[in-house]
Amino acid sequence: MPRKTWRAALAAYASPSTLVLLLLGFAAGMPYMLVFSTLSVWLREAGVARAAGMPYMLVFSTLSVWLREAGVARETIGYASLIGLAYAFKWVWSPLLDQWRLPLLGKLGRRRSWLVLAQSLVILGLIGMGFCDPQKHLSWLIAIAVVVAFASATQDIAIDAYRLEIAQDTQQAALAASYMSGYRVAALLATAGALYFAEGFGSTGFAYKHSAWTGTYVLFGLLMLPALATTLIMREPPVPLRTQLSAARYGFTHQLASVFVLIVLLVSVPAMFTQLYNTDFASVLFNGTSWMDLLLEDRAFLRAILYTLLTFACLSSMGRRGLAPVLTPINDFIMRYRWQALLLLGLIATYRMSDTVMGVMANVFYIDQGFTKDQIASVSKIFGLIMTLLGAGVGGLLIVRFGIMPILFIGGLTSASTNILFLLLADMGPNVKMLILTISLDNLSSGLATSAFVAYLSSLTNLKFSATQYALLSSIMLLLPRLLGGYSGVVVEKFGYHNFFLITALLGIPTLVMIILQWNREIRTAKTEEPKQATSIDQP
């Protein structure tokens, strides 16, 4: 790809699309933080060991604070955190957004119609949550929160698809930086800001006042209106004819059926193995129990058979036909990249592993080092947010200027190497100057890496299935880092912070190797295509 001038790179931020993505990013960050309750505060206050691996950075979890202040049991608050699964599995219903246009609202276009529906549900849901007192209407509050979570996840899908369709690959980083800026500002406002508002309206840990939380949630619901207005004003991205034809391939009933079959499959497979593990096969092998007696007496064996039948039903020819709307985008990705898809999926699954695993224990590390909460809030939260946004902006600028792969490599290298700064900080105690330096470089590299990675993911998707493929790839991006992050506390307890930060830095090496391999392959591909293009131009 030919390099562009700095003026052309800066021009990427001057387009109206960047302002649109800024407002849409604000709309995406607002409901996520207001609804997605975490357990970090509960676990830390209850004295649970660090092996729980919960990110202390989500201490400003608004819904959990509200529920706890209202006197709701910790166990119930813990179950309420499962609402966040809507964001993890949003790829399940993403084909609906690719292949079905809503009635009535469909006149706005495929992307805008889904955005209007999702944003309207979020606004009404947040206001409705505000009028539900957890002390009296807890079930209603949780039910509405579930609706808001699914609507918010649907909004995320539509925004990502819209972003992919309005700009070229090299411009995606600038749009991603703008989106990230709006998202992070909304996240800060919806967490710390919401708590300040609730306390300002008269609700504290010592004197719960429902009307204060009503005012807070109604206010934040109304703050979604500018995003809804933006959706109504902005233009629908152009849809190629081939995409329109593919959208009509599956009917709405078939698409709903595919979502149902996929959910059954996702539930049945792990449940099948769990019940087989719990079945008492030893009684048959060593005690002479018949299989019929085992079936009649062991409920786990009966459930295992049931889940096995459901799994095979989903994988049968009829089940695969039902899954076609979901499998088609996946098959398209595999057919386009073939064996290379393994390398790409490995790169995607590990790119954010180094900084994500480290980030799980970062704020707990600050406390254990002896930093005050004011220092953590000022340096890590506020100053760190500024450096992250600066890094994202610089990343978008550099990608337009130099291309995606060089900046993707630099982002991966700096994200892993800055973990060494935490290693040095671990030997220095509560050194504020070193903390500022560490946070500056770490968040700057994180922002740069994020913008580069979003641009790279965007370049891998097919516009026919932009919503589905991007939702799936972004889920893969988070899966392995979050799983490993769950054991970060165990590593710290066993090996200490010094070795923990060294290990997280080394986790970035496989990713860098895969980036180099993919980068070299793209260079070879570009060299082989140049003579073909020159030959086609010379032909009369």
Task: Label each residue range with its predicted role.
Residues 4-87, 270-280, 342-347, 351-365, ...:
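Helix-loop boundary and gating motifs at the non-cytosolic
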Residues 74, 169-178, 373-377, 463-473:
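Loop-to-transmembrane helix entry/capping segments in MFS-fold secondary transporters
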Residues 1-15, 130-140, 154, 168-350, ...:
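Intracellular loop-helix junctions on the cytosolic face of multi-pass helical membrane proteins
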Residues 460-494:
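A late C-terminal transmembrane helix in Major Facilitator Superfamily
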Residues 39, 153-167, 448-462:
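Intracellular juxtamembrane helix-capping segments at the cytosolic ends
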Residues 406-453:
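C-terminal transmembrane helical hairpin of 12-TM major facilitator-type secondary transporters
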Residues 103, 114-136, 413-430:
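C-terminal ends and interior cores of transmembrane alpha-helices
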Residues 89-107, 390-407, 492-493:
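Helix-to-loop junctions at the C-terminal end of transmembrane segments
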